[in-house]
Design a protein with these regions (language model features):
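Short loop/turn and low-complexity linker motifs enriched in small/turn-promoting residues
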Residues: 1-157, 183, 193
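Short loop/turn segments that connect beta-strands within the blades of beta-propeller domains
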Residues: 55-57, 140, 149-150, 188, ...
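Residue-level detector of high-confidence beta-strand sites
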Residues: 70, 144-147, 255, 274, ...
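Surface-exposed loop/turn elements that mediate protein-protein interactions on large endomembrane-trafficking
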Residues: 127, 152-174, 197-222, 238-256, ...
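Repeated scaffold domains used in trafficking and secretory/extracellular systems
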Residues: 130-137, 172-186, 218-230, 258-270, ...
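Hydrophobic beta-strand positions that form the internal "hydrophobic ladder"
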Residues: 143-145, 192, 235, 272, ...
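Ankyrin-repeat and related helical/solenoid repeat scaffolds used for protein-protein interactions
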Residues: 311-356
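Blade-level signature of beta-propeller repeat domains, shared across WD40, Kelch, NHL, RCC1
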Residues: 348-376
Length: 376
């Protein structure tokens, strides 16, 4: 080989090394050539990734229709990397479960997270618990109180640990008859307050269901119109149907919403759910990443034409709610569309979510049903 040939070959390899060396380094650092740039975007950009955490474990992750990863067995999570900045369709699948799908944006040098994914079963199973139930209440301790009617009077019973225990009868309240209109639960004790109608007058009675023998005490000056609760240095007051909040370091209450049916704190104590006839909303007690909200902000999660009858938290990132003829579950991740699941179509359901058992109870047409465990 002549000296000239060796010089040419050496020059070629030197050129390739000069070009390829930095390119390899840039590639290892996550830089990619972006051929789909729009005006103002960089031709060479760093990639990003998606972090998925889902239950059940070992779900398949599809990105833009391609299987890219599977979550691990131990933690149910996976990191999928090396994506150019942009929007991607992400789908999480597992046999026997309904899929989760959302369009998520990946940014340069950032990891987009979806850490609260729950996949629900394709079929929901319910079992009949008891019949001939007129009304039902659920205690803060996650137990059930229900009212049954006999030919002569109503009976109030407690259902706990799969056992039914009679609490009291109509004649215990008033021998000539008393209409039970509501049960109010104490925020500080196990006491119950019975709201009754006797001779067309409202009368309230306090009793402790754990006390033996039973002792009823009439409350002469009870006012249930104002109910206050404190969470994370916020104080919430429900005055009639108005929900008000007193922020930390403030002496004044600010109205959040009118026509509020009920409000509930999330298990992580970072969010407050409240709902009206046609809206489900959240008040944030702390900063959150998903949804991206600051402490003290409000968010309308859902607006429905149907009448919303009740709502409960599932964990701290999903909500189960009922309408006049449906029970549904939805997430609170408001990036793209909400993943919403139809649980059952049923007439006028009264629902209760038992967080400890991870089971749903519903009352419909005087029959009380209980689900199998809903969470994976």
């Amino acid at each position: 080989m002549t000296k000239k040939s060796r010089t040419i070959i050496f020059s070629i390899f030197s050129f390739l090394f000069i070009i390829g060396g930095p390119s390899a380094i840039l590639y290892s650092q996550g830089y990619r050539l972006n051929l789909n740039t729009e005006e103002g975007e960089k031709l060479i950009t760093q990639t990003g990734g998606i972090f998925i955490k889902a239950a059940p474990r070992q779900v398949e992750i599809y990105i833009d229709g391609k299987l890219r990863e599977k979550t691990d067995f131990l933690f149910g999570s996976a990191l999928v990397e090396n994506f150019l900045p942009g929007k991607y369709n992400v789908e999480v699948n597992k046999t026997g479960y309904l899929p989760w799908e959302k369009t998520l944006e990946i940014k340069e040098k950032e990891v987009t997270e979806a850490k609260s994914i729950l996949l629900f079963p394709e079929e929901f199973s319910f079992n009949l618990l008891t019949e001939e139930i007129e009304d039902i209440w659920f205690t803060p301790e996650q137990t059930i109180i229900f009212k049954k009617a006999t030919t002569s009077e109503w009976i109030l019973s407690l259902y706990k640990s799969e056992e039914e225990t009679e609490l009291l009868r109509e004649s215990d309240v008033y021998s000539k008859g008393a209409k039970l209109t509501n049960i109010i639960f104490s925020a500080t004790s196990s006491d119950l307050i019975l709201e009754t109608e006797i001779a067309k007058n409202k009368r309230y009675f306090n009793f402790d269901p754990e006390e033996t023998p039973l002792s009823l005490t009439e409350l002469k000056n009870f006012n249930q119109e104002i109910i206050e609760y404190a969470y994370n240095n916020y104080t919430f007051k429900k005055e009639g149907e108005s929900l008000c909040v007193q922020s930390p370091n403030s002496d004044l209450f600010e109205k959040i919403a009118d026509s509020v049916k009920e409000f509930r704190i999330s298990p992580d104590h970072k969010k407050l759910l409240y709902f009206t006839k046609h809206e489900i909303s959240i008040f944030f007690l702390d900063d959150t990443i998903v949804p991206n909200k600051k402490k003290g902000e409000k968010m309308v999660l859902l607006r429905l034409s149907d009448n919303i009858t009740n709502c409960y938290w599932i964990k701290s990132n999903h909500i189960i709610f009922s309408t006049d003829d449906n029970i549904k579950i939805t997430e609170i991740d408001n990036r793209d569309i909400l993943n919403t699941v139809d649980v059952i179509e049923i007439k006028n359901p009264e629902i209760f979510w038992n967080e400890n058992e991870e089971k749903l109870y519903y009352l419909s047409e005087n029959n009380l049903f209980i689900s199998d465990t809903l969470l994976p």
